[in-house]
Amino acid sequence: MKKKANEEKAPKRAKQEAKTEATQENKAKESNKENKNNKAKEGKIKEAKTKESKVKETAKEPIPVKKLSFNEALEELFANSLSDCVSYESIIQISAKVPTLAQIKKIKELCQKYQKKLVSSSEYAKKLNAIDKIKNTEEKQKVLDEELEDGYDFLKEKDFLEWSRSDSPVRMYLREMGDIKLLSKDEEIELSKQIRLGEDIILDAICSVPYLIDFIYAYKDALINRERRVKELFRSFDDDDENSVSDPKKDDDSEEDEENEERKKVVSEKDKKRVEKVQESFKALDKAKKEWLKALEAPIDEKEDELVRSLTLAYKRQTLKDRLYDLEPTSKLINELVKTMETTLKSGDGFEKELKRLEYKLPLFNDTLIANHKKILANITNMTKEDIIAQVPEATMVSVYMDLKKLFLTKEASEEGFDLAPNKLKEILEQIKRGKLISDRAKNKMAKSNLRLVVSIAKRFTSRGLPFLDLIQEGNIGLMKAVDKFEHEKGFKFSTYATWWIKQAISRAIADQARTIRIPIHMIDTINRINKVMRKHIQETGKEPDLEVVAEEVGLSLDKVKNVIKVTKEPISLETPVGNDDDGKFGDFVEDKNIVSSIDHIMREDLKAQIESVLDQLNEREKAVIRMRFGLLDDESDRTLEEIGKELNVTRERVRQIESSAIKKLRSPQYGRILRNYLRI
């Protein structure tokens, strides 16, 4: 019996053991799967973290560049020189000081090794100019050859016809923009170097003429006194504070007055800092100029090595150029310098042409005007604007004479100041123009290659009050600022740097131009804060919050919040159509409170009729006195007793007596009852 019982229990135990083994195996498999999943997740997280860290490293840390020693950098300079010469200034840029005797020995060895000649920066620029002219002629010839080959290409003509079918300027702009290739990072660096090269050539030319340094230094007082805007002439000074802070308006609200006073204090502090910065920069420029002139005018020591002297002068000149580079003169200032130099070169026929061009604007059609014109020209440099106004017959001629005065003054000052031969001056002018051409070409190429970036950013700002083309143009302005301020040495891509400038330019344009009535920038910041709080409450509660809650969260008074919300309301045009008919306009339904209503008009006419009927009870003289005394004539003006007496040829006392007798008659109850009803209305 026991054996049978054990035999019966055996398969049951086996089944239970098999079940337990199966469950253990399943658990083991599940745990293995979980471990694998966890490991995979950890691996992904680690990969993501490593990617993020790599991105952060690439975004934050600049690309490490191996710094070359003086000898290595010098070797590279001589080896990579485009022409058969090397400038003194390029050597100074490597050493950042006057080279030692050992370094000068190395320079001489490299000159012999590479068969290079040491020259000044102006001579080096002249060499590069000659090379550039050859390249330009070759490029022009290539373009002409391509045009001749494509002259009979009918397929391209067909493509042009299809392209020209689109009338939308946005489509045309986007289509043309799509043909421009994007730049690689190496190409961006190369273009940045080209921009710097062009600016170096310009500054080299300016530094070679002391008068041009004085010409730039003369802007110091104009900048401090705000006669000229700083950012028009120099990029290094941030002059955007003038635009960002608007003139505070007068308001009865004491809180707004306090804010305006605080804003004025902030503006005055910024003005002080700006003036200090301008003074420091120009002081450093003046100091560098004096040191350079001192080295230039120092007596020549026959025992001193000529190369040492040349490198010393180059070092002083490079210091002056660095101080000038700190100011970052704009294209507008460089154009003014070019115009000054061109005016100096316009001696003889050139100057006469400019003079005749301005004289053509004057109406000199008789001998008297011609004689007066010659008299003014004889002493125009000593005349003020008031003197010119006193001598010319028409106000329109004053501006022309002021231009003539500027022409004569510029010619006199430049002839005295430049103290250079015309050929030398012409070389410097060509050097400035060439540097500007190199810089402008590189800037244009960099800007054109990033137009797609502007469009992609401008798309995010649509439906904000400005047309899409306007957004693109404002973004392009920001792009050009980014091109001016980009520094490739920091290791960032240009698109990363330019994005902020483009967004800033577009958002500022929307704030300034999107609304019919302009709102100051500081008010827009407050509006955005209030809108953010209101959106947050709507998302959380599903309804608009009370203004008290908004005021508390924003940190403003309730009245201030109400005023800000009033400001945000867009004005409605009087030409807005109303109703289904096209003829109905909103302006037709607006009440004109200056016009008398029809009921008031009827009441007034009825009152006039009743007054006339009452006055008919008086004699002619009494009627005339009452009408003139109480303004019942057509002009509705009250006259004094003296004025009435003069018109009626009676004394003042007699007029008073007539008036009192007439009023006595009108006080009768039968007349007063009629007019009393009008007083109640």
From Swiss-Prot:
Residues 446-516 are annotated as: Sigma-70 factor domain-2. One of its GO terms (molecular function) is sigma factor activity. Disulfide bonds: none annotated. Signal peptide: none annotated. Residues 1-60, 239-270 are annotated as: Disordered. A motif (Interaction with polymerase core subunit RpoC) lies at residues 470-473. It holds the Pfam family Sigma70_r3. Residues 261-270 have a biased composition (Basic and acidic residues). Transmembrane segments: none annotated. One of its GO terms (cellular component) is cytoplasm. It comes from the Bacteria. This is RNA polymerase sigma factor RpoD.
